[in-house]
């Protein structure tokens, strides 16, 4: 198993523990430390970040992304107790200007909705991605979500209790 290695970078690793199953977009393991990176298509402005509303809470349009990352972080903690987990959202940075012309020509959407990527000779795809993508540390917000009760009909419940309740209902094909 790749996660038994001391250092590894995995793309879309599947992690299952009990009734919980997740696929993390990118997972970087270094000893007992993890970087959980969720890649989102929603754009982000690194010059004028707008993740939080006027009153300091996570904006409603961003909340599902944070909650998804929080759930994945929680499951990863269950699978690797005592580990250190930093959680990131990676999003296109609309404050950046592409350093080459015709970047849109590098991506083609196929009839089955898959995306085909063609990187021309001489173009460093990794450097291009690092320039155009923002890796935003959301660890403090994820920790706040995990420490706060989840409001739902029948709730509120602590995050872990709500997750276990929903997993039980899902496993038994019962409504929540």
Sequence positions of predicted segments:
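Cysteine-cluster motifs in flexible loop/terminal segments that predominantly coordinate metals
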Residues: 153, 157-176
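Mg2+/Mn2+-dependent nuclease catalytic core
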Residues: 6-152
């Amino acid at each position: 198993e790749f996660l038994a290695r001391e250092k590894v970078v995995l793309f879309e690793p599947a992690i299952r523990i009990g009734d919980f199953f997740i696929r993390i977009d990118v997972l970087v393991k270094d000893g007992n430390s993890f970087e959980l990176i969720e890649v989102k298509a929603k754009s982000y402005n690194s010059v004028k970040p707008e993740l939080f509303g006027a009153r300091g809470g996570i904006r409603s349009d961003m909340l599902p992304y944070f909650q998804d990352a929080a759930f994945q972080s929680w499951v990863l903690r269950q699978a690797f107790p005592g580990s250190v987990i930093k959680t990131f959202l990676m999003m296109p940075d609309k404050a950046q200007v592409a350093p080459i012309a015709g970047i849109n020509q590098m991506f083609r959407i196929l009839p089955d909705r898959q995306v085909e990527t063609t990187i021309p000779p001489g173009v460093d795809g990794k450097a291009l991605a690092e320039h155009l993508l923002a890796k935003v540390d959301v660890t403090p917000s994820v920790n706040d979500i995990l420490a706060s009760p989840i409001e739902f009909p029948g709730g509120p419940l602590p995050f872990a209790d709500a997750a276990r309740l929903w997993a039980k209902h899902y496993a038994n094909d019962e409504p929540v």
